[in-house]
């Protein structure tokens, strides 16, 4: 993932936006994808913004100068890739835990809204109704999903337990694929034979990832806290054969 972000930063620093080859990574190939050929500067900048920042409106050159765009871009990269658990908690640990869990619940709730939105698009398609409004609503839900994930990344900065980095990695994997999901949803309204199966697979992954993060948190933090509030990690290592693997 760090290599992907490094590629993006080199693109943003370039004056000419040269042709970028298709990335070889299978895990994050949706993170940066460029069609063959040369983009004009505005299109290239918008393309970079679209894939890295699925929740943000496309930023045009007349709206932001290059330095300001670069500053916002670097700040977002730092939020996504920085290690979790860097900051010591200054208030009651329960406050941080409740905020952390509330954000996780919001991620799951939003992912389920994505599933409902996709179902609405399918029902409109089967009835031969216009799809534009349904597609737009679903794309806006993807934007909201990105914002919630970013809020979770901020909450992950606190050293809540020894697994905040692992859970952030799970969230990061889902976050980086939101742009690919958004494209799949947009294509539903652009083809006579829309590929609902592809969009459904991507939505199901978002739901699965959200459920996995919540389950991991409850098993490694909430249950551990009930067992022994003074030693969460010790309980987890006793209960789980490999606490760093998905449950």
UniProtKB/Swiss-Prot annotation:
Q: What's the protein's topology in the membrane?
A: Lipid-anchor
Which organism does this record belong to?
A: Caenorhabditis elegans
Q: Where in the cell is it found?
A: Cell membrane
User: Keyword Ubl conjugation on this protein?
Assistant: no
What is an annotated GO biological process for this record, any one?
A: dauer larval development
For the lipid attachment N-myristoyl glycine, which residues are annotated? 2
Keywords for this protein: Cell membrane, Lipoprotein, Membrane, Myristate
Provide the function of this protein.
Together with eak-6 and sdf-9, negatively regulates dauer larva formation downstream of the insulin-like receptor daf-2 and in parallel with age-1, pdk-1 and akt-1.
Pull one GO CC term from this UniProt entry. plasma membrane
Q: Write down the superkingdom of origin.
A: Eukaryota
Instruction: Give the stretches traversing the membrane.
Output: none
* Tissue expression as described in the entry: Expressed in the 2 embryonic head hypodermal cells XXXL/R.
Q: What is this protein called?
A: Protein eak-4
